[in-house]
């Protein structure tokens, strides 16, 4: 089965906002390496050649909203911002709302706090999913944990699964779909011609930072910032 072209996928970014473990801060807007994390995710989506970026979360004021729009301006389908109903209903509700805006046959499901995500890695996971014969592909970390919010899916099987799923867990929804598992290192950086190698605007993260590294608490945020500082040239 041939790999799909990168333009055949949209991206759904779950960017719900306030985080209890971050003292109520707007986590996606927190900066790592001089840029808000959600801007870094959007830049990776654009570099991967997505058709459109769908952000599920509140409208961002200040500098974040215009910066997000600027990054997505080059996408054929542009930027779409929506909210799950009711707001704060959880990741499955957010995915359901975001999926309703997907027009491509594939989608990337992404968190908004992935400062080390790159376009080349995202395209590599997409290629693995497309060639696997399965409904999607999910990276698996060294501890065997599936990283649902850095995964790629066929839109129609995901819609069908959502139609009958009544729970609130992403793992409960996505696990039974039996996606291809992408081991650490399997989706190699730079394996897709024509895309920039590892590195991101505002800093060059060191090689050991995995693309699915997220920042769920202050310690992880501090670790991400330190990695960017260590990698700056």
Regions found by a protein language model. Give the residues of each.
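Nucleotide and nucleotide-moiety/phosphate-recognizing core
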Residues: 2-168, 172-211, 218-222, 229
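Cytosolic-facing loops and C-terminal tails of multi-pass membrane proteins
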Residues: 232-233
């Amino acid at each position: 089965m041939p790999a799909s072209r990168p333009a055949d996928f949209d991206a759904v970014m779950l960017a719900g906002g306030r985080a209890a473990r971050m003292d109520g801060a707007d986590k996606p807007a927190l900066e790592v390496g001089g840029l808000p994390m959600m801007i870094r995710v959007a830049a990776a989506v654009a570099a991967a050649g997505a058709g459109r970026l769908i952000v599920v979360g509140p409208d961002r004021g200040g500098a974040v909203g215009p910066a997000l729009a600027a990054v997505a301006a080059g996408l054929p389908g542009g930027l779409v911002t929506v909210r799950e109903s009711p707001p704060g209903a959880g990741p499955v509700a957010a995915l359901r709302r975001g999926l309703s805006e997907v027009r491509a046959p594939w989608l990337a499901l992404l968190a908004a706090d992935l400062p080390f995500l790159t376009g080349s890695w995202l395209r590599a996971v997409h290629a693995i999913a497309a060639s696997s014969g399965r409904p999607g592909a999910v990276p698996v970390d060294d501890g065997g944990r599936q990283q649902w919010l850095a995964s790629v899916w066929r839109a129609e099987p995901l819609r069908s699964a959502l139609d009958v799923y009544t729970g609130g867990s992403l793992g409960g929804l996505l696990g039974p779909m039996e996606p291809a598992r992408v081991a650490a290192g399997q989706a190699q950086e730079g394996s897709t011609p024509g895309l920039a190698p590892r590195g991101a605007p505002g800093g060059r993260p060191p090689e050991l930072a995995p693309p699915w590294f997220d920042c769920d608490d202050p310690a992880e945020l501090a670790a991400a910032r330190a990695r960017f500082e260590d990698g700056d040239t």
